[in-house]
């Protein structure tokens, strides 16, 4: 069973443009060690789905008692007209020891796009360590079919050599993103924009993943502590394509 959004449509007169087959799908929760719980655990256990009594928000709640990782998490989704959904994710760990000696946890979300105009993802970033900020068109490289892009100052995750989720953990050394937003161009002249309230802090970070036709992202927490609350805010926009500068401006407006 998938979590998240079953569909997302943009209506223009009599036309309907669908973004994905499933979106904001929390697919994996993983550690730095080989563990059967690294793969598809969010699909295997029940959620509570609640609607705000006076408001437009929907909450997807996973109780710690229903999580093999003993983590409780809540994703709040709120429509923001005319073309956006605001996302607020919060989590708390009852037993961090389950994540082992590497002491980090990753949450992985997938958006299974229906039809892409361009398989790459686009963001502001640097193409090498000493580069200046520019527009990056990111796609598979260095012989990898897929992989993950890091914030400019982030470090690659260390993981066991026999890990069963290496595909999701490995990352490209370059390019790096310098602003916490990306966009992906879809068929019918549409664009999906994802933006976040952080690049990287001392305890957590956002990562962009390239698994076309999915547009994915990860939230990684380092040094997980018992009962401490973690989380991030984000916005998803689905609208007709104009220019990449307008995508950047959408992030700036949301950030302010």
Q: Language model features by range: what are they?
A:
Residues 120-164:
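Glycine-rich (often Gly-Gly/Gly-Pro-rich) flexible segments and glycine-rich loop motifs
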Residues 152-256:
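Beta-strand-rich recognition/accessory modules
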Residues 30-84, 91-96, 100:
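Extended, loop-rich substrate-binding clefts of extracytoplasmic carbohydrate-active enzymes
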Residues 49-57, 80-81, 126-128, 186-187, ...:
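Short, ordered beta-strand-loop transition motifs
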Residues 1-2, 8-20, 65-73, 97-100, ...:
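Short, surface-exposed beta-strand/loop "edge" segments at domain boundaries and coil↔beta transitions
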Residues 82-138, 244:
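Acidic (Asp/Glu-rich), glycine- and aromatic
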Residues 1-49:
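Acidic-aromatic substrate-binding/catalytic surfaces of carbohydrate-active enzymes
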Residues 1-5, 10, 55-64, 182, ...:
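Generic recognition of long tandem-repeat/solenoid scaffolds
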């Amino acid at each position: 069973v998938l979590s998240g959004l079953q569909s997302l449509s943009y209506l223009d007169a009599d036309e309907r443009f669908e973004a994905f087959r499933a979106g904001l799908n929390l697919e994996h929760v993983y550690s730095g060690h080989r563990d059967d719980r690294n793969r598809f655990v969010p699909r295997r256990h029940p959620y509570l789905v609640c609607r705000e009594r006076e408001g437009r928000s929907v909450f997807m709640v996973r109780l710690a008692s229903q999580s093999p990782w003993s983590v409780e998490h809540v994703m709040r989704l709120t429509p923001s007209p005319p073309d956006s959904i605001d996302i607020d994710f919060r989590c708390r760990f009852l037993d961090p020891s389950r994540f082992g000696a590497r002491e980090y946890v990753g949450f992985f979300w997938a958006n299974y796009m229906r039809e892409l105009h361009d398989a790459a993802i686009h963001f502001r970033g640097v193409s090498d360590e000493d580069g200046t900020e520019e527009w990056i068109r990111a796609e598979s490289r260095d012989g990898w079919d897929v992989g993950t892009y890091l914030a400019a100052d982030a470090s690659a995750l260390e993981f066991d050599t026999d890990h069963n989720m290496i595909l999701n953990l490995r990352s490209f050394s370059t390019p790096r993103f310098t602003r916490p937003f990306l966009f992906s161009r879809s068929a019918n002249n549409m664009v999906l924009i994802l933006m976040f309230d952080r690049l990287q802090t001392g305890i957590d970070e956002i990562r962009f993943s390239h698994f076309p036709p999915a547009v994915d992202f990860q939230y990684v927490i380092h040094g997980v502590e018992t009962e401490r609350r973690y989380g991030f805010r984000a916005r998803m926009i689905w609208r007709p394509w104009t220019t990449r500068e307008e995508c950047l401006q959408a992030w700036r407006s949301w950030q302010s």
